[in-house]
Amino acid sequence: MSETELEKIKVRTAEHLENDKNNISWLKEDTQLTNAKHADEKPINAIVINSVSDFNITDGPAKENPNEKKLSESSTSLSSLEECQTTFSYLQTDTSVHHRDTDEECASLILACLFCQFWDCLLMLPGTCETVCTKMCCPSRRYHHTSDENHSRNDCSCNCDMDCSLFESCHETSECLELAMEISEICYR
């Protein structure tokens, strides 16, 4: 097909669409109902989302670009903030949802520390602590052996000679409780 034939088809399709809009009564009624339903509503010029719990609709002027359609000319508008929140379920005003996860994580961390479960506590902390302890216990993981010698399959000898007061503190309840409180203070910041 040539370009002129494609243009003729596009023009005919557009003409048929316009004729259908003018001749089909239910299409006219639907357009009128839609316009009548939203006639009293104010069009949205800008939507500003500062955070999940903070959602503002502003009526400030939008930047105009001659190639773009003005947002105020658009037929899209929201009747209320509630409608928007039901449409976009991630816009919740209830901030307690986000605090619950942090509270549960901190409680688990404190309990692991109080019951002297050091490795559970270590795995709950960010990955950097685990990496530091792994590097101290298994120094062979820090570098790749380049020699041609045959190494045993068990590459990690794990000489865990860590002089860490955390292991000693775990046997004293008051020290462990103090450590747990410091950890929870960090979690709640």
UniProtKB/Swiss-Prot annotation:
Family that this chain belongs to: Belongs to the MDFI family.
Record-linked InterPro entries: MDFI/MDFIC
One GO location term (cellular component): nucleus
PANTHER family assigned to the protein according to its UniProt record, in alphabetical order: MYOD FAMILY INHIBITOR (PTHR15304), MYOD FAMILY INHIBITOR DOMAIN-CONTAINING PROTEIN 2 (PTHR15304:SF2)
Upper taxonomic lineage: Eukaryota, Metazoa, Chordata, Craniata, Vertebrata
Gene that this polypeptide is encoded by: MDFIC2
BP term (GO), one: regulation of JNK cascade
Pfam families in alphabetical order: MDFI (PF15316)
Name of protein: MyoD family inhibitor domain-containing protein 2
